[in-house]
Every structure is written in structure tokens, then in C-alpha cells.
Amino acid sequence: MTVQIITIDGPSGSGKGTLAAKLAAYYQFHLLDSGALYRLLGLSLHKHDLLEKLDSHLDECVNYARQLNIKFETSAEGTLVFLDGEDVTQTIRTERVGEYASKVAAIPELRQALFERQRAFAQTPGLVADGRDMATSIFPEANAKIYLTASAESRAERRVKQLQGMGLDAKINDILANIQARDKRDMEREVAPLKPAADAYIIDSSELTIDQVFKLMVDYVNSRTVSN
């Protein structure tokens, strides 16, 4: 049976994760949060004092990427994420770990090490894959390719609300600066830079609600022959 694949790419804070989860639930597909993999690897390398030694200890870092001990569990509260048996669901969503992930994602050898792990998520009946290069690199054969974007300012505002909702301190100027820096790093990296696939459906969510974007996505996906 052919596995149907929906990709959602876009910059940090555009709403990819929330909408990918909604689509996966709607179509009863598997879900890949590729950003979580990079965050988990970044966190693991930081814990092992390797994040600042990527160049000098690259082989060791690649081995960590290949042997990353991770587990995803679905619960009533959402998806729980474990690293080496420890629940790191909240930890990996912090700005600091997001910066770790961006550093890791800029290293071609580490991206390659995570390539097959991501491909393995494509199982019947289908997959919703959320990331930066899902359509351009990991799943170019996807049935439906969505590129979700929004202005840096609107993404910063959303991120502040998200962090405050988690009980974390967040300053809009710091968040905006981090988003702009990550955008630049993601778009200018040599391997798999952040950009929409040539045949992607582009949605700017700056002035749209989650429900409005979700409807646009479902209409598009259904037009690409993926049925509910």
C-alpha cells in the first residue's frame, strides 16, 4: 500500500507543530515532528559537553545522532518526548534548546545521520511530517506539500504567549531577535536551506487563526487526493 505523505515546512514559530498535529489527528496519520529530533540531538550533545565542539568532535557527534535514545508517547495532554528515559517534553521547547537545534541542523553530517530516522516514520496509512526541509529533502515524493510562514513579528508574539503559558519568562525583543537570527541561519545553511518546494502550497498565517489555516490546509490536501 502506498503511504500518503503530507509535509508542512516553514520557519520557527509559524504554527507548524500545532497544525501538523491537527492534520495527523484529522486524517488519522502518523506524525513526525522533525524539529523535536534536532532539539533532542542538540540537548543530548549539550549534556555530553559536545555542542561547542562540533567541528573537533564531529565523528563522535554523528555517533550520538545515530544512537539517540528517544521515545514519543501520545497522551491526553499531547505528545510526550523522552530522551534517555527522561521526560523532556517541556525542556526541548525552550528558546535555548531551539538554538541548540539550529546549530545542529547547520551541520551536513548530522543532518544525514538523522535522514533515515525521519524516513522511517513514513508508514501506512500515512504521515504528516513537520519541519524545515520535509518537502525539499526528506520526502520530495509527498502527495501534499505545504509551506507555512508568517512575519517575524507575529511569530515572536505567538512565541511569547506560548512561553508565558508554560510559566516561562519571555521578552518580546529577545524572542524577535532569536527568531530573526534562526531564520537567517536556516535560510543560509549550505545543506537543505529553508525554502518552499517548487510545488508547495504557501500559506501566510500572519493574520489568520489556527482554524482558518487548518481549513485552508484540509481543502488543499483533499484536492491532492488524500481522503479522510
UniProtKB/Swiss-Prot annotation:
Domain of life: Bacteria
Enzyme class: transferase
Gene Ontology biological-process annotations: nucleobase-containing small molecule interconversion; pyrimidine nucleotide metabolic process
InterPro entries: Cytidylate_kin, Cytidylate_kinase_dom, P-loop_NTPase
EC numbers for this chain: 2.7.4.25
Binding locations of ATP: 10-18
SUPFAM superfamilies: P-loop containing nucleoside triphosphate hydrolases
Reactions that this protein is recorded to catalyse: CMP + ATP = CDP + ADP; dCMP + ATP = dCDP + ADP
GO cellular component: cytosol
The family this protein is said to belong to: Belongs to the cytidylate kinase family. Type 1 subfamily.
Cross-referenced PANTHER family: CYTIDYLATE KINASE, CYTIDYLATE KINASE/PANTOATE-BETA-ALANINE LIGASE
Protein name: Cytidylate kinase
Species this chain originates from: Acinetobacter baumannii (strain ATCC 17978 / DSM 105126 / CIP 53.77 / LMG 1025 / NCDC KC755 / 5377)
Encoding gene per record: cmk
